Amino acid sequence: MSSAERYVSLMRAARAGVSEGLDAHVVASAVAAAATGDGAALVDSLGLEPEQVATVLSELFPALTEMFARLRGLNFELRAEPDELRLRELLTGHASQGNVSNLLAALVARGVLRPLPLWRELGLSNPGELEWLMQRHFAGLAARNTHDMGWKAFLCDALRSNDGGFCLATLTGTDDAAFAATAF
């Protein structure tokens, strides 16, 4: 099944409601991009424990609850880089929507450390969808991005401001210029 077909299947199974539909779109985009047919690969890509993934996916896509239940029994040890854990902590400290925000915090934290622009790492269609995600789920943090920095650069800068540490993210495009302007 292609990524586009997985996305369509997930969206057909999404819970009704405007804001939930937007959340479902963001999560379905990430899941469709990450899913390779292997539960362990999906869980690893999403950056949460199997039980957490099954819970939030069942919440957003109730018609597929039975399918996601298989993730609960998955024997999988989640591994995360120290920067990813710091980013996740920063994001969850500003999360506003419960289980969905926690999943998105894990996705964003993992995506920041990957090479593509963050919106692409999350499987989104454009940077505007990432902006919406940050405003909706991490409003307090998003409000601090007053210089319109790229999100990877902003989150790395926020980590540095928060705890004085560095973030080893791969910055791309405008993220590079924005980070270079504020990092030192």
Features from the language model and the residues they span:
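Hydrophobic, aromatic-lined core segments that form the binding pocket/scaffold
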Residues: 1-154
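Cys/His-clustered metal-coordination modules, chiefly Zn-binding fingers
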Residues: 133-184
